[in-house]
Amino acid sequence: MTCSVQPCEPDEQEDAGNRAVCPVLAIRQPIDHHSTVSEAPTDPRITVVVPTYNERENLPKLVGMLADLHLPNLGVLVVDDGSPDGTGDVAEQLGRDAAIPVSVLHRTTKDGLGRAYVAGIVRALDDGADIIVQMDADLSHPAEAIPRMVAELRNTDAAVVLGSRYVAGGAVAEDWPWHRKALSKWANVYVNTILRLKVRDATAGFKAWRSSTLRTIDVASVGSNGYAFQVEMNYRVIRHGLRIAEVPIRFEERVDGTSKMSLAVQLESAAVPWRLLRSNIGK
């Protein structure tokens, strides 16, 4: 409630000789809760989308790390592709027991990383997320980088923020296999040469997105799968005249389980940049 001053009526005033004091009436009026003049900024709703396939050992650790961030309005959406090791059941249990909200999107078809991410991102958008974070379940992405990525997104004009291995301050784990390091470096040179993305880590899978960016690039129509999905998402951002920012992270080797990198994924990753170059995205 607020107060306003009610002025004296003429008949309440006395002549100057009596020097009477005009009474001041404090009239209580309701606050306009829709006013934006003095409203404090609200914390954005953040959804971390985590695709899973046979990650029952890693998922509880990841959710615990995310809870330890104590970020307001942060929740997790697990997108499980029918993991035979029971990851989906573990995710459901986390939804009941975890310190932060955990929801699960169960898919019956294992049709690739890109399809899982699209399904999860579309669900998160439908649920009202303001910021959507892409994150692997294998603990290779450092959860502690998320506050910095979100801050970069909120305090600059960046459309998306990458957790980058290859900007100053970024690194990869010493125990990451040499052939994976070489393949990653080559893929970045290859993609940037063809598509001119002008980002250091074009194949990064750790990203914080504005919901408005994801709608602008029409994420539901992204056709690439596997790791090429990351490249197409970046390309759509650039083609729409938006800016990609990068913050340094240390990329770790997975803790448990096996890598999903296959020959088919590598072949798609080699072909997709040429397909994108011939597309009419952003035109």
Regions found by a protein language model. Give the residues of each.
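A conserved acidic beta->alpha catalytic loop
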Residues: 80-89, 139
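Acidic helix N-cap motif at the loop->helix transition within catalytic regions
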Residues: 57-61, 85-94
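Hydrophobic helical membrane-anchoring modules
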Residues: 3, 8, 18-43, 189, ...
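Cell-envelope/extracellular polymer assembly enzymes that use nucleotide-activated donors
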Residues: 45-47, 75, 232
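Short beta-strand-to-loop acidic/aromatic patch adjacent to the donor-nucleotide binding site
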Residues: 129-140
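Acceptor/aglycone-binding surface of glycosyltransferases and processive sugar-polymer synthases
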Residues: 107-126, 143-227, 254-268
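Short beta-strand/loop segment that forms part of the nucleotide-sugar
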Residues: 73-83, 105
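Short, acidic, metal-binding catalytic loop of nucleotide-sugar glycosyltransferases
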Residues: 64-73
